Structures are given as structure tokens and as C-alpha cells.
Swiss-Prot record:
The phosphoenolpyruvate-dependent sugar phosphotransferase system (sugar PTS), a major carbohydrate active transport system, catalyzes the phosphorylation of incoming sugar substrates concomitantly with their translocation across the cell membrane. The enzyme II complex composed of PtsG and Crr is involved in glucose transport. The gene is crr. Binds 1 zinc ion per glycerol kinase EIIA-Glc dimer. The zinc ion is important for dimerization. The active site is at residue 83. Its cofactor is Zn(2+). This is PTS system glucose-specific EIIA component. It comes from the Bacteria. It comes from Borreliella burgdorferi (strain ATCC 35210 / DSM 4680 / CIP 102532 / B31) (Borrelia burgdorferi). Zn(2+) binds at residues 68, 83. The record marks 68 as: Important for phospho-donor activity.
Length: 189
């Protein structure tokens, strides 16, 4: 650490679940671009609700014209990408209703896109929803919250944690997260 590094401010950003459901490791996503963290590091959620919410305050950078994904830029310079399902681009927007618009500032928990979850379950390859930090190479650390255990404690791991079978088993025992309420990612920049 150099002398000037002492004066650099670090920012911590807590991201809430943008959709209710079961949190899983990003490497379980059935799409190589997400599973290999090419798009960015983060988590995935197997959804149970019908709305995609803003995981934090920020400015909507992009909403795909098919309304299946959006990006959010925070004042701290963190770029978040929320992508509903796998190959849902092929649905040409069917099952998705845009609520917010590109370029607007949103607050944590605001609805960005409404979903017809039953239709999407029937017509998409997968509804697993990756939530990633697109510029994860520019952040100092990422912690993942996989939900709460039976004793109501949060199960949080860092990006340096090796996902052993024991840890994967513990993750599988967590309760589903609630959109707009439960922490899913903590990012330090």
C-alpha cells in the first residue's frame, strides 16, 4: 500500500434481491457467459415473484428492447446487470412489461420490469436470473448472501471462498430471499 492509497475512500454498496426466490451460485447458471463470470461476478436467483426491482439506488443505463434485462450504474461507479432467464431474448419481449425507462434515476426497491412468470416458465429455456457486477474487475471485494439459515442468520461468503461440497450443501439449506428486502450482494469499491 502506497502513501496515497491511505487517502482513497472505499465505498460499500449493499444490493437487495431484485426478485424473490432461491439464491444460487453464479457457476450454476446454464449459460457459460454467466457461469464463467465473463459478464461479471455475482449470484443467480431462481425466481418466485413477478417483478424485477432496482437492487440499489442508481441510474438505469440500459433496458434491452425485449425487456428481459437491465443495467444500473451507481454513484460509486458500480455497474450492475440483472438478466431474467436464459435465452429469454428469443421471446422478443413477450412476458415482460417495462415500467421504468433508460436514463432515469431509481431508488432501491423500485419496479423496473413486470413479468408474467408462468408464461416465462413455460416458454423460456430457464428462468434463473443472474445478478452480476459487470465491472467486477474494478471493485475490491464482493460478498454474496445466499439467504438466511433456519436460525435466521444470514449466510454470507466472500468472492475468495472456495465452493466446496460442504459449502454448496449449506447454501442449498438457505431460505429463499424476498425482493426489495433481503441482501444478496455487498460490494466494496
Amino acid at each position: 500500500m502506497g502513501f496515497l492509497d491511505f487517502f482513497k475512500k472505499t465505498a460499500t454498496l449493499d444490493l437487495i434481491a431484485p426478485i424473490s426466490g432461491k439464491v444460487m451460485s453464479i457457476d450454476k447458471v446454464p449459460d457459460e457467459a454467466f457461469a464463467e463470470k465473463i459478464v461479471g461476478d455475482g449470484i443467480a436467483i431462481l425466481p418466485t415473484s413477478n417483478e424485477l426491482l432496482a437492487p440499489c439506488d442508481g441510474k438505469i443505463g440500459k433496458i434491452f428492447k425485449t425487456n428481459h434485462a437491465f443495467s444500473l450504474e451507481t454513484k460509486e461507479g458500480v455497474e450492475i446487470f440483472v438478466h431474467f432467464g436464459i435465452n429469454t431474448l428469443n421471446l422478443n419481449g413477450k412476458g415482460f412489461t417495462r415500467v421504468a425507462e433508460e436514463g432515469i434515476n431509481v431508488k432501491q426497491g423500485e419496479v423496473i420490469i413486470r413479468l408474467d412468470l408462468e408464461y416465462l416458465k413455460e416458454h423460456s429455456e430457464s428462468v434463473i436470473t443472474p445478478v452480476v457486477i459487470a465491472n467486477s474487475d474494478e471493485v475490491s471485494s464482493i460478498e454474496y448472501s445466499f439467504g438466511r439459515l433456519e436460525n435466521d442468520s444470514e449466510y454470507i461468503l466472500s468472492s475468495s471462498t472456495v465452493l466446496t461440497e460442504e459449502i454448496r450443501h449449506k447454501i442449498s439449506q438457505t431460505k429463499p430471499v424476498i425482493a426489495g428486502k433481503d441482501l444478496v450482494l455487498r460490494v466494496k469499491k
